[in-house]
Design a protein with these regions (language model features):
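Conserved catalytic core of the tyrosine transesterase superfamily
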Residues: 1-147
């Protein structure tokens, strides 16, 4: 089966069987197309049925040089779904993506206020009425909870 036919069948499956949005389908197609483009650029003539995990690992290594871990994870997820589909439709016997792990995605810690900034906020509260005491209570509770 040619790549173009496999991709079209996969898109049809995603739309009809899985009911995914057009945007999601476009992203999956884009991910698989990146692999196909890599194979074409490197003059590697292999079908979707015959590609092995080593070629895919080479592709992912090249991707890792220019893409962040979140993008790499999305591409891996798209390829995993594509090859799951090929196995489901009996175009392939196995999914070469099964043993390929997604990169860890680091989380950015939130920016926090300094003690000086908190003190300035508290000092700015007008304590001449009940709303000021309410606001002070809310700010102190948020601060003490680490929010």
């Amino acid at each position: 089966m040619k790549w173009i036919n496999a991709i079209k069948d996969f898109e049809h499956f995603l739309k009809i069987e899985r009911g995914l949005s057009e945007n999601t389908i476009l992203n999956y197609r884009f991910d698989v197309s990146k692999l196909v483009n890599y194979l074409d650029e490197n003059k590697i003539n292999v079908s979707a049925k015959d590609i092995d995990k080593y070629l895919i690992q080479e592709f992912l290594f090249q991707i890792s040089k220019t893409k962040n871990s979140r993008t790499q994870s999305r591409i891996i997820s798209g390829l995993r779904s594509f090859f799951d589909y090929l196995v489901f439709e009996n175009y392939r016997l196995d999914n070469p993506m099964e043993q390929i792990e997604t990169p860890k995605i680091g989380r950015k810690l939130p920016d926090t206020l300094s003690v000086k900034e908190i003190d300035r906020i508290i000092a700015a509260i007008d304590l001449n009425n009940y709303l000021g005491y309410r606001n002070l209570t809310i700010i102190e509770m948020l601060y003490s909870c680490g929010l």
